[in-house]
Amino acid sequence: MIFVCGIHGVGKTHFCRKLAEKTGRMVFSASSLIRRKVENDFKEKQVDSIQDTQTVLLNELRKITLQTPDYILDGHLCLLDNKNKIHRIDMKFIKQMSISLIILLVDSPAKIKKNLKERDGLEWSENFIEQFQNSEIKYAKEISKKLDVNLQILLSQQSEEVKFGESILLPIKPQYAEKILCGEKRYEYRTRLCNKNIDQIYLYSTHPVRAVVG
């Protein structure tokens, strides 16, 4: 799952739409998934019980993963409570989301303020927006390091520059297939591939075909 995050008003919806066109993946919004189960007013971008809503979100994501494991989630790493205090999503929830890539969108506080005013009628100060965005950036870096997940931080207006590796299909000699597919033997591919930006490698047994793994 590709997790696209960033504070409110940074342009995640537009970016996710473009990303879906590029990758062929479906897009889901964290807040929309939560609304399916919880009647909550997100107008002010505040959440009363962050832990409860994240539990709901995880349950909805599990259902999606059963149908389509490769998708895009539009969400946040930090949220506001009903007193406008910034809270991190608990790491235990993030860990269960099975994220393969984090894309964090950022922009200038002035631009985000303008977007929020025009779109939602919200009046957030630039200082508050900067604080909120810095919290999201700091936490994204911590998550990337602790969970060993790739992180790309992009300026919203440069978001078309996001790079994805190609997927390649490689053969396994029959005598090595079982050991490689069960993890007893490492698969070493040709050195010429090392210069490529590879996102996923799929292996298959040349004869007979026993399994394909990603």
Regions found by a protein language model. Give the residues of each.
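Conserved lysine of the Walker
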Residues: K12
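ATP-dependent NMP and nucleoside kinases share a basic, alpha-helical "lid"
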Residues: H76-R119
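Small-molecule kinase domains that catalyze NTP-dependent phosphoryl transfer to phosphate-bearing small molecules
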Residues: E118, L122-V162
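Hydrophobic anchor at the beta1->P-loop junction of P-loop NTPases
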Residues: V4
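Structured alpha/beta reader/binder surfaces that contact nucleic acids or chromatin modification marks
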Residues: F164-G214
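Conserved nucleotide-sensing/catalytic segment adjacent to the nucleotide-binding pocket
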Residues: F42-N82
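Conserved substrate/cofactor phosphate-moiety recognition/catalytic segment
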Residues: R17-L58
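Walker A (P-loop) phosphate-binding loop of P-loop NTPases
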Residues: G9
